[in-house]
Amino acid sequence: MGKIIGIDLGTTNSCVAVMDGDKPRVLENAEGARTTPSIIAYTDKETLVGQPAKRQAITNPKNTLFAIKRLIGRRFTDNEVQRDIEIMPFEIAKADNGDAWVNVKGDKLAPPQISAEVLKKMKKTAEDFLGEPVTEAVITVPAYFNDAQRQATKDAGRIAGLEVKRIINEPTAAALAYGLDSKKENQIIAVYDLGGGTFDISIIEIDNFDGEQTFEVRATNGDTHLGGEDFDNRVINYLVEEFQKEQGVDLRNDPMAMQRVKEAAEKAKIELSSAQETEVNLPYITADATGPKHLNIKVTRAKLEALVEDLVSRSLEPLKTALADAGLSVSEINDVILVGGQTRMPLVQKKVADFFGKEPRKDVNPDEAVAIGAAVQGGVLAGDVTDVLLLDVTPLSLGIETMGGVMTSLIEKNTTIPTKKSQVFSTAEDNQSAVTIHVLQGERKRAADNKSLGQFNLEGINPAPRGMPQIEVTFDIDANGIINVSAKDKNTGKEQQIKIQASSGLSDEEVEQMVRDAEANAESDRQFEELVQTRNQADSIAHATRKQISEAGDALTAEDKAKIETALAELETAAKGEDKAEIEAKIEAVIKASEPLMQAAQAKAQTNQAGEQQSSAKDDSVVDAEFEEVKENK
């Protein structure tokens, strides 16, 4: 069995590692670097990846692709994609299935197809080191990646010729890397992962017992559209605006000039992590009728921090949510680990230290920790590492739409995966022959406020009164966080299932918005839930009353029946509205109008009871006739 390599497929940079004996080793690429820029360039003759692609970007901006991870598993209509369209020099296009793809030299390319080029380079780097073919890998993704994005990442691996043995979350992988060198018995760590395009926070408990380590994720949260690229864009916009003020020329219309500004902005941002001031000097950036123009702008660390302070602050809200979900206070966190190149920024380190009340660890390499952890997990799957157990979680609740437009959760957020959960549901109408299983992901009570992952029908249900058929719905989340849903009629044994497809995943903004909305709208959610319960009560009463009318037959006068029917019609109209009090009033009206129905039912019951007693008395006399003393009286 060959080695299972670990790959950190990053937005800005990627990294590959492998177990070398009992230690993970980060591998150097063909250019001698331990990380590879996640940049792909398509020229007339070849496809370039990494540093060679980056070097020619200025002369080939429309066919040099970067930050493709921000598009993977996304719909073209997502707000984040629309924002990226405005700032990316290459053309983002709408695919036939509605996904966001990229136009390159007249061809539409899917993000997994493009990302596969980076994975191929990682694969080749590992093969050069090991001297043998590599066919299996563990690939990391942001913890807050949804099902669509995880599926798309697996697709990228497959396109690159790799069997993806496991998709694991980046903060969890970093915790594995940290745990290798930590021999403390029990500890709880926070992994703050601010990469090139995504942000994650995970609270992880590490237990050392009898030589074995267990890594259990207690909670995770994040913002999958927040990262170093956003910091770069703030600097780019500042430089472009300052140049326009000075020279009266807008560089945004010149892709080649913008590529130079982008590289200079990234370089300035990095330099300001160690220096208080830097100078961006780009001679001959453009020209007009008066001659060539040169860009020369000084940027201070204070200016940079002012430009990005709100981005850093945005990362603190998920920290609070993750701690609350884990049921922990800041004081219970033993260590804070920083992952991702953007965490080298002093302002980020200060904000994190202020939040946790302790300095983050500096002994974990933020660029390499994730790949190292992926290699460790590869070792676990290959059987080379036997003393490590990893327990990860699903970041959002999963469930189905039930009567009244409510989302009924089967698996709550932060549930350890892999996991499987079943629940029995039934029909909402008499003689219903089919049910639609509508799969949802999110935290809101109202089904429409969550994201639809897909739906399917279970047909061939035997005719029966509503509430009688038993439909068992099962959610199965594998260790990659990928979802399968099935529905089975327990009476007939008929079953249908759906594997959630990549094209139906959530947008990252929707994921974040769901959690924020759930917290901000707890009261409106409660009111909606009460409204639905009242509607369902109205429906049940209407159904039961009509059944009783049918059973009462001639025992109910035409006048009483008309009153009840009028009250029922008013109740059904009210139940379609949003006024809970109105529905409750109409329920009371039906109950009042149904009093003659109750009396008729009671009278009928008494008549039946009297008949039974009379029949019983006759039976008794027949029995007595068999006794000898009765015969003597004759």
From Swiss-Prot:
Gene3D superfamilies: 1.20.1270.10, 3.30.420.40, Actin, Chain A, domain 4, Substrate Binding Domain Of DNAk, Chain A, domain 1. Residues 599-610 have a biased composition (Low complexity). Keywords: ATP-binding, Chaperone, Nucleotide-binding, Phosphoprotein, Stress response. The keyword S-adenosyl-L-methionine does not apply. The keyword Iron-sulfur does not apply. Residues 599-634 are annotated as: Disordered. This is Chaperone protein DnaK. It comes from Haemophilus ducreyi (strain 35000HP / ATCC 700724). The gene is dnaK.
